[in-house]
Amino acid sequence: MNKYTGISTLENMSQAEFYNKWTFDKFKDYVRGDILEVGCGIGNFTLTLSKYGKITAIDIDQSLVENLKKDKSYSINAGYGDIEKNDYFFQKKTFDTIICLNVLEHVQNDTKALGNMFKLLKKGGYLILLVPLYNFLFGEIDKSIGHFRRYNPKELVKRVQDLGYDIVSYRKLNLIGLIGWFITGKILKNKQITGYKIKLFNLVSPVLYLENLIEPPIGTSILIVAKRNK
């Protein structure tokens, strides 16, 4: 698994408060019980998740984990974890919900990582997976923040099913972000998402509510909710 190289991008994305809340609202009904956040980063979703259950947060970057543990607003159990290597600071623990948001694309052997998450999931538990879509969008930003790939939606859904998960739902998200990502990363060849671009995105983000009415045919990301039934 790639150690995250886009800390500034994570910090800038923390300012996309409307988008982060809108995204969380898409899966919050499945967040419960013992929660594992895979790749917590700087904690853009961690505090919100901690209000829905008992949270364990892992990241391959120990320094990010230590910063989270210093923040007294969190009530979490945080430590080192590499989902690809099946190596964690905890032992013999399973979870009701596993959250993996914009992490799988940083993992070289993503199939192995998905399989390891299945092992960590209790029977009846949910995996919530958010990943970037479409290799035609793969550009300088993806390279600079350590992405190995972007995903084909049908292929990823099938791969998740083949590993034993039952698909509860999946949908493409953030059509307007796709346009910005293509211009920024492919045409302008920028290597990061700047704070200025996030401010522009915040201005147009209310348009995302239209996606609550109808799923866009394409999007920047796909959100998959899967369940372990066996």
Predicted regions span which residues?
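Conserved N-terminal segment of class I S-adenosyl-L-methionine
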Residues: 1-93, 97-101, 112-114, 217-222
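A short glycine-rich, Lys/Arg-flanked "PGG" loop and its adjoining helix->strand segment in the class I
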Residues: 111-126
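Short, glycine-/aromatic-enriched active-site segment of Class I SAM-dependent methyltransferases
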Residues: 127-149, 155-159
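Conserved S-adenosyl-L-methionine
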Residues: 165-175
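Residues lining the SAM
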Residues: 101-104, 130
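A C-terminal cap/extension of S-adenosyl-L-methionine-dependent methyltransferases
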Residues: 3, 14, 88, 174-230
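Feature marks short, surface-exposed loop/turn motifs that line or immediately flank catalytic pockets
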Residues: 64, 87, 135-137, 176
